[in-house]
């Protein structure tokens, strides 16, 4: 028991040490800067519901801003599972404004083809057609979305991955268009916040974004825009989830 306690303390000290290094510079020098992720790209963030952009992808959005990416956002539903669609669309726009995504670059799909419902399977080909249209119209050269695990396992998240995976494997994406997927982690790693940083550094192969303290506050402010969703367990999520601080992503 004592050994476990000492291990937790050591991990905490190590993690906060890493954070100090990131906070000490004006701009974090992340792995993506020396890898395959260039500057000034036109990036499309593809999400399933309003609040995905803040709950899961805030480190990516803010990290891309450091690299001067022009970020577009495509949300495949209005989040109307509890008949709150109109409210949630407004909350999404407020959150995007906090994260620095131009409102003119935000597209929300609100139709019966893509219901906010974990029990409904979205048609992969239909999702892929809509996605490809937005990629081509906006001249996108980087697509960011969920991986096969969908982070939370939500079927709508996984449907987005299936669609972009199909476009990629079938060679339908425009030349020079890459795909990044957000790594799903186990429940323990998901809820240890910054303590996951050493593991993220060890296991991330392609792109790693880690927020400094100022950026974490910005991410939390974006999440707080989704007032209709701030139930007690989501407030705990904001405090403990690694996804409010850390995003590790892989190229297809």
UniProtKB/Swiss-Prot annotation:
Cytoplasmic compartment spans: 23-252
- The record's principal subcellular location, in a coarse class, is endoplasmic reticulum
Localization: Endoplasmic reticulum membrane
Q: What catalytic activity is recorded?
A: a 6-(N-acetyl-alpha-D-glucosaminyl)-1-(1,2-diacyl-sn-glycero-3-phospho)-1D-myo-inositol + H2O = a 6-(alpha-D-glucosaminyl)-1-(1,2-diacyl-sn-glycero-3-phospho)-1D-myo-inositol + acetate
The answer to keyword Heme applying to this record is: no
GO annotation, cellular component aspect: endoplasmic reticulum; endoplasmic reticulum membrane
Query: Could you name the domain of life of the organism this protein comes from?
Result: Eukaryota
Membrane topology listed for this record: Single-pass type I membrane protein
Segments traversing the membrane: 2-22
Broad EC category: hydrolase
The UniProt entry, under InterPro entries, shows: GlcNAc_PI_deacetylase-related (IPR003737), LmbE-like_dom_sf (IPR024078)
Gene3D superfamilies listed in its UniProt record? LmbE-like
Q: What is its EC number?
A: 3.5.1.89
Gene Ontology BP, a term: GPI anchor biosynthetic process
Pfam annotation, one family: PIG-L
Q: Name one GO molecular function term.
A: N-acetylglucosaminylphosphatidylinositol deacetylase activity
Q: Which UniProt keywords apply?
A: Deafness, Disease variant, Endoplasmic reticulum, GPI-anchor biosynthesis, Hydrolase, Ichthyosis, Intellectual disability, Lipid metabolism, Membrane, Transmembrane, Transmembrane helix
| Biochemical pathway | Glycolipid biosynthesis; glycosylphosphatidylinositol-anchor biosynthesis
The family line of this record is: Belongs to the PIGL family.
Which purpose does this protein serve, as stated in its record? Catalyzes the second step of glycosylphosphatidylinositol (GPI) biosynthesis, which is the de-N-acetylation of N-acetylglucosaminyl-phosphatidylinositol.
Give the disease association: Coloboma, congenital heart disease, ichthyosiform dermatosis, impaired intellectual development, and ear anomalies syndrome: An extremely rare autosomal recessive multisystem disorder clinically characterized by colobomas, congenital heart defects, migratory ichthyosiform dermatosis, intellectual disability, and ear anomalies including conductive hearing loss. Other clinical features include distinctive facial features, abnormal growth, genitourinary abnormalities, seizures, and feeding difficulties.
| Domain-related comment | Retained in the ER by two retention signals, one located in cytoplasmic domain, and a second signal in transmembrane domain that is functional in the presence of membrane proximal residues of the cytoplasmic tail.
Q: What is this protein called?
A: N-acetylglucosaminyl-phosphatidylinositol de-N-acetylase
| Organism in which the protein naturally occurs | Homo sapiens (Human)
């Amino acid at each position: 028991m004592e050994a476990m306690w000492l291990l937790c303390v050591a991990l905490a000290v190590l993690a906060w040490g890493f954070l100090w290094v990131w906070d000490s510079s004006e701009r974090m020098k992340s792995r993506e800067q020396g890898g395959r992720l260039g500057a000034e790209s036109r990036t499309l963030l593809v999400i399933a519901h309003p609040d995905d952009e803040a709950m899961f992808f805030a480190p990516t959005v803010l990290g891309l801003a450091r690299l001067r990416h022009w970020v577009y956002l495509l949300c495949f539903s209005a989040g109307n599972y509890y008949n709150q669609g109109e409210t949630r669309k407004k909350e999404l726009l407020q959150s995007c404004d906090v994260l620095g995504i131009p409102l003119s670059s935000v597209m929300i799909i609100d139709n019966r083809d893509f219901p906010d419902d974990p029990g409904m399977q979205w048609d992969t080909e239909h999702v892929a057609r809509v996605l490809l249209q937005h990629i081509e119209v906006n001249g996108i050269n980087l697509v960011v979305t969920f991986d096969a695990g969908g982070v939370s396992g939500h079927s709508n998240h996984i449907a987005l991955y299936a669609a972009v995976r199909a476009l990629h494997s079938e060679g339908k994406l425009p030349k020079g268009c890459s795909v990044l997927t957000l790594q799903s982690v186990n429940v323990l790693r998901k809820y240890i916040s910054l303590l996951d940083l050493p593991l993220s550094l060890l296991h991330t192969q392609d792109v790693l974004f880690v927020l400094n303290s100022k950026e974490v506050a910005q991410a939390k402010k974006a999440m707080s825009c989704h007032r209709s969703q701030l139930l007690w367990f989501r407030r705990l999520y904001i405090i403990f989830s690694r996804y409010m601080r850390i995003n590790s992503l892989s190229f297809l």
